[in-house]
């Protein structure tokens, strides 16, 4: 893990060469942002200045979903890709309402509730998005993504969603939806430089039946780190004791 810092901020990050090739500039994945002086608040301009001074044009940020202050600042930097990655534990879900953001809420487990409806969730903005201040980078990323999609999908099946910035109504990001489609999963995996593992949908599976299928992929030998839109299926993963990350992408967040 690398660090960049000045007299105000410290950013811990991992460098990703794959995205350098995609975007034509230095790209990092931010793991943590710390204030040098804890009395101060995290300021948008301070963060932007530190990244710019180090030649970073694109940053992916992994932030606990409950850290709303940092997310508020990061959302103002609308040319950065903003991601929340939260590790969920079954005992947390059973004991309290767990919020992932303004559109995402997991309600407590109720005794006698069927495991297929343990979680009641509302997702309005879900997918993978990229934000740019520079629309040339925007176009370059979209073209790269189209090339990848051509390998897996017919053109008519492309599910590209153009999102609009709520402030100025300019198109600032693209997204692809419905990761449960296998071909889309393969395309997404190549785009992100990650491994795609096909896991069957929950359906009427029990935990034991799910574990049997997971074993076919050798997944019990490694941590699962996949985006899951079907949260009841995520619950079964947790009951099996598999390490698991639930990922959502937040496109716009406003603090009232």
Task: Show where each model-derived region lies.
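Conserved GNAT acetyl-CoA-binding A-motif
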Residues: 54-64, 215-226
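Conserved active-site tyrosine of GNAT-family acetyltransferases
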Residues: 72-74, 236-242
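A conserved beta-strand-loop-helix scaffold within acyl/acetyltransferase catalytic domains
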Residues: 14-20, 129-194
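Conserved acetyl-CoA-binding loop-helix of GNAT-fold acetyltransferases
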Residues: 39-50, 199-216, 235, 239
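A short beta-loop-alpha structural element at the N-terminal edge
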Residues: 105-129
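Acyl-donor-binding surface of acyltransferase catalytic domains
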Residues: 35-113, 248-253
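A short helix-loop-beta-strand connector motif used in the catalytic cores of GNAT acetyltransferases and
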Residues: 1-2, 55-57, 82, 150-162
